[in-house]
Regions:
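Compact, aliphatic and Gly/Pro-tolerant "microcore" segments centered on a short helix or tight beta-hairpin
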Residues: 181, 203, 220-222, 235-237
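Short N-terminal edge-element motif at the start of the domain
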Residues: 157-202
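Generic beta-strand structural signal
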Residues: 143-145, 157-158, 199-203, 216-220
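A short glycine-rich, hydrophobically flanked beta-strand micro-motif that places a catalytic Asp/Glu
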Residues: 196-211, 307-321
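Histidine-centered divalent-metal-coordination microenvironment in nucleic-acid enzymes
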Residues: 163, 204-230
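Active-site microenvironments that recognize anionic phosphate/pyrophosphate groups
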Residues: 35-173, 226-275, 279-388
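N-terminal amphipathic/basic-hydrophobic helices that include classical n-h-c signal peptides
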Residues: 1-35
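Intrinsically disordered, low-complexity regulatory regions enriched in Ser/Pro/Gly/Thr
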Residues: 3, 196, 214-215, 309, ...
């Protein structure tokens, strides 16, 4: 029995659907994207979709037609940070200098509210409300979301999950959004849509004025890890039991990478291979939401402790078996902007001058200044405001 994913405006919809579900078929590469719209109504349909082939098809077509601002980097370097022992990719990204921004306020601003006129301007200049059809991968996901390509991608097959209606980037992720993220990661990394190159996808959400975001419309991003880089978080969560939400406060503390220069918190996730009942699916959703809110509350303690004027800002990063949060106090250090990518070992810059500056300042210094410094007794720190 086939799921009820809908393809509109394309006469051979059922054939296409069969190809999307079958990762061994590559005829989908011949689809002309503008003749097809894709609707995914349930998480189960999303799990069974050959998502990577669909993303790849839309990306390759858009690139060939000039709808993307992208070219492969020719000067990418992998550099090990002598302090953190983390391997970092440093490269010049063509689209960064052309990428527009549509922020509610500039980093460092002490404005506490957004004027109505400013909000209206942002909505007018919002690229996600009516995305370009050539960049759209899934037109409707669970009725409330879209999956679209990043027009100025940092790497191949860089895409976004966006809300259909305008929502602020500073709003919290809700339980269904967390479950969609987790389902997409499962699909791309080990499910029907697993990409054949071996690279692994991660997701990231930049929230708050100092988080490094450029667009105020709510969006979560997905990118592949460079093949040469192993996420340090994998070593942190290896041989560790997953967190059980009800046991967090009593028995467990979040994990962290001890060689890092910046405060961050990592939680190991339970991996679900399949769901036999609706109750199991709800259990995953509730668990992800509880763990995410635990990280949010712990981050709020950081801002309270530092009595920082900055509104809550953070980078939330997730893979299939862990989630991490990095509280942020600065969006940039000496003109070097950082969003979540730096905390995954990816330093992407506009030009050679900025590349040399990154190498001169050092990865650990940049990340420490953009986040909060990791303390020597970090593993013994107890926060009392929320009981964590």
């Amino acid at each position: 029995c086939q799921p009820s994913v809908e393809y509109r405006g394309f006469p051979r919809a059922r054939l296409i659907f069969g190809l999307l579900l079958n990762p061994n078929k590559h005829q989908i590469l011949n689809i002309k994207r503008h003749t097809m719209t894709v609707e995914v109504k349930t998480l189960e349909e999303l799990r069974k979709l050959n998502l990577f082939e669909l993303i790849k098809t839309v990306f390759d077509n858009a690139l060939a037609k000039g709808d993307l601002v992208y070219q492969d980097a020719v000067d990418s370097q992998i550099v090990r940070d002598p302090l953190s022992k983390i391997d970092n990719e440093v490269k010049i990204v063509d689209g960064l200098s052309k990428r527009p921004n549509n922020r509610a306020s500039e980093p460092g601003s002490k404005e506490k509210t957004i004027s109505e006129s400013k909000m209206e301007d942002m909505k007018k200049n919002n690229p996600f409300t009516n995305p370009e059809p050539e960049l759209t991968v899934i037109d409707s996901l669970l009725g409330q979301y879209r999956v679209i390509l990043n027009k100025y991608p940092n790497s191949k097959y860089h895409f976004l999950l966006v809300t259909k209606e305008f929502e602020k980037q500073d709003s919290l992720l809700n339980p269904i959004e967390l479950q969609i993220i987790h389902t997409i990661l499962d699909n791309l990394n080990k499910g029907e849509g697993k990409n054949e190159g071996g690279s692994r996808y991660f997701s990231f959400f930049n929230s708050g004025p100092e988080s490094g975001y450029s667009q105020f419309h709510k969006h979560i991003q997905f990118m592949m890890m460079p093949e040469e880089i192993r996420p340090y978080q994998e070593d942190v969560v290896r041989n560790v039991n997953y967190f059980i939400p009800k046991e967090i406060v009593e028995n467990r503390r979040p994990l962290f990478y001890k060689n890092a220069s910046f405060k961050h918190y990592i939680l190991k996730l339970k991996e679900y291979d399949s769901f036999e009942t609706e109750e199991e699916e709800e259990d995953e959703r509730d668990s992800l939401a509880t763990l995410y809110m635990y990280l949010i509350k712990r981050s709020m303690n950081i801002f309270r402790e530092y009595e920082d004027h900055v509104k809550l800002s953070y980078n939330f990063i997730m893979m299939a078996d862990w989630m991490m949060i990095v509280p942020r106090r600065n969006a940039k250090f000496e003109d070097i902007w950082q969003n979540a990518l730096g905390f995954m070992g990816m330093f992407f810059v506009k030009n050679e001058e900025m590349k040399e500056k990154v190498l001169k300042l050092g990865f650990s210094k940049i990340l420490e200044e953009c986040a909060f410094p990791l303390e020597e007794d970090e593993e013994h720190i107890v926060y009392n405001e929320y009981g964590y």
